[in-house]
């Protein structure tokens, strides 16, 4: 039994802390959730993103897509589950989950977005990085709570945090894809 849980029903009271309100998360719809009825994929990603599972209930397609690709190895120029690069992953995700077509390269994706500040990032925005010191050279898709999904050269498709030392120093900005 954990704090806030009801041992008879297995439900857990959602944490309505101000950090979720600051993210614009729909606190008015949060309440109790029966853990046994929660989709395992959503539960997994709620833990990874450090947010209440209720927030993910309307985004099942996004997290099922991420789950299907998670761990896919990085391959420069790749565009399938045998290997994919960062811009291939972001364009595939945007097309399949959000029905938005974005260009194939990270540089072109950056040039074809409405720029947004880090504090304005919303789920589905693109996040851009200057990895090589020559402008945009890496892209990911923003999720929530400072987390983004991307195809990392070292780890393949993973979720990372914009606050991590490496990514915080390489972050160039965010972009909202034009529909």
What feature does the model see in each segment?
Residues 124-125, 146:
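Structural motif
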Residues 59-63, 67, 87, 91, ...:
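Extracytoplasmic/secreted envelope proteins and their assembly/folding machinery
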Residues 1-72, 178:
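Intrinsically disordered, low-complexity
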Residues 1-10, 136, 143-179:
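Aromatic- and glycine-rich peptidoglycan recognition patches
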Residues 72-123:
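Catalytic cysteine-centered active-site loop
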